[in-house]
Amino acid sequence: MLRVPLADGTLVATPGVPSKDIIPSLLSTSDVFGTGWFAAEAANVKPGMTVAVVGDGAVGLLGVLSAKQMGAERIIAMSRHEARQKLAREFGATDIVTERGDEGVARIKDLTNGIGADAVLECVGTQESMKQAIGSTRKGGYVSYVGVPHGVQLEGQELFFAHVHLHGGPAPVRRFLPKLIDLVLNGKVNPGKVFDLTLPLEQVAEGYRAMDERRAIKTLLRP
């Protein structure tokens, strides 16, 4: 027996039974891919834009993939982890920035001729990551924030003179599901690559531990 809460509104059927090899990608559409897609949409990503992504977890990496699908010309991924940098490039990143904080902002300004990115996706939720996102954005640009905030406080005057658009919050994933599922079924994207650790359900605690210790990007649990 399987119980799906509010299935009339939340359950989206696939056209037939999908093959096992795309199950991880389909699973991602209902969570991290949907959130990454919202991050790109909320940042108003358009064809030809320069986009920066703060955060190299599953959501940030799929924010890179989403920005690529939306036509971004240049995508700067901020990451210090080699395996995640490699995946970011597979998903469409053109540049990698390893610096953080003020140094990270300066590096993005260097890469954009002192202007800043047209759009920045904040996918972490810390004070430092939010300041880094705002500081990396050009005047009149867009910042989306989908990382659950942890002690984030924005200084009013600093935000006022930054002159950027802010849009974020919990991702309305259900709205994107039909499109994202279609992208997966048609072989246009492979977001399931973020699942780099597979464990049996009884080892769920180890799965969370591995993600917390940065030994895994995303854990896939099997019964």
Give, region by region, the residue ranges found by the protein language model.
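C-terminal hydrophobic helical "lid"/dimerization subdomain
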Residues: 131-135, 174-223
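A generic alpha-to-beta junction signature in SAM-dependent methyltransferases
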Residues: 43-45, 112, 124, 136-138
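Glycine-centered, small-residue-biased loops immediately flanking beta-strands
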Residues: 49, 141-142
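Residues in the short beta-alpha loop(s) of Rossmann-like NAD(P)-binding domains
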Residues: 81, 149, 172
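Rossmann-fold NAD(P)-binding glycine/threonine-rich loop
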Residues: 147-163
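Hydrophobic/small residue at the entry helix of a nucleotide-binding pocket
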Residues: 35, 59, 67
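NAD(P)H dinucleotide-binding glycine-rich loop of Rossmann-like/cofactor-binding domains
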Residues: 1-54
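Adenosine-nucleotide cofactor-binding segment
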Residues: 53-56, 68-132
